[in-house]
Design a protein with these regions (language model features):
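Helix-to-loop junction immediately C-terminal to a conserved catalytic motif
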Residues: 50
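ABC ATPase NBD coupling module
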Residues: 67-87, 117, 230-234
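Conserved ABC ATPase signature
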Residues: 140-144, 148
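A short, proline-enriched helix->beta-strand linker immediately N-terminal to the Walker B motif
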Residues: 159-163
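Catalytic Walker B motif of ABC-type/P-loop ATPase nucleotide-binding domains
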Residues: 165-168
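ABC ATPase "signature
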Residues: 224-225
Length: 256
């Protein structure tokens, strides 16, 4: 049964149509990889789900919350409730530099969920342990690698106990050698049963972790199926062309 449905979502930036009538149904436990060319609306789609971007047309249905678009002032409480239940991990870490890892993870629990400091600390420590950083709880972001900072950001999201986790290119700001530790963390939380939507250029990772893959181009979903169907047997010429180019990029330029 779907816990999230997007219906006829449209989003433009001036004359540039970024999302052009998106329909998407997400079931509990889905791990949906979102792939496609750069600039085709992948990040905008994620940001539209929790209304960081505000579509001009459509409807968002999340369990018992229905939000018609464009947004009206009377729906502000619904937006707040939606954001409490959908967590997001961004390309950048957005950690507070003057707070420790533990304090960063506790922040939303105290300010948004109104937890007591004692309960917030307990939940934050559990989340840091989940991403392998409990021992780093008293370190400040400046003393941590980019990969560790992103894992703290993931812990911050998980501590809020979201129903859905959105991940927007979570490794794009990292040095190549730090990518693996973050992907390993994402794989571990996926195995815990979270419902996830992941935008990433790490195609091999997306193909292995996802239960379902959608391919966006020109603001439309033109492929939607299992990883095998989309990556190996795409139906559209555009997806075939895209994956052929991606495969060529992985081929060595020369042989010794």
């Amino acid at each position: 049964m779907a816990i999230l449905e997007l219906k006829d979502i449209h989003k433009s930036f001036r004359d540039n149509v970024v999302l052009d009538g998106i329909d998407l149904s997400v079931n509990k436990g889905d791990i949906i990889g979102i792939v496609g060319p750069s600039g085709t609306g992948k990040s905008t789609l994620l940001r539209s789900i929790n209304l960081l971007e505000r579509p001009e047309q459509g409807e968002i249905q999340f369990e018992d919350i229905t939000i018609p678009l464009p947004l009206k002032s009377k729906d502000r409480k619904k937006v707040t409730e939606l954001r409490k239940r959908i967590g997001m991990v961004f390309q950048r870490f957005y950690l507070f530099e003057h707070k420790t890892a533990l304090q960063n993870v506790m922040e939303g629990l105290i300010t948004v969920q109104k937890k007591s400091r004692q309960e917030a600390e307990k939940l934050a420590l559990e989340a840091l342990e989940n991403v392998g950083l409990k021992a780093w709880q008293n370190h400040y972001p400046r003393h941590m690698s980019g990969g560790q900072q992103q894992r703290v950001a993931i812990a911050r999201t998980l501590a809020m106990r979201p129903d859905i986790v959105l991940l927007d290119e979570p490794t794009s700001a990292l040095d190549p050698e730090l990518v693996t530790e973050v992907l390993t963390t994402i794989k571990q939380i996926a195995e815990q049963g979270y419902t996830m939507l992941l935008v990433s250029h790490e195609m091999d990772f997306v193909s292995k972790i996802s239960t379902r893959v959608i391919f966006l181009d020109g603001g439309k979903i033109i492929e939607d199926g299992s990883p095998s169907e989309v990556f190996r047997h795409p139906k559209s010429d555009r997806a075939k062309e895209f994956f052929e180019k991606m495969n060529k990029l992985k081929e060595p330029d020369y042989f010794i």
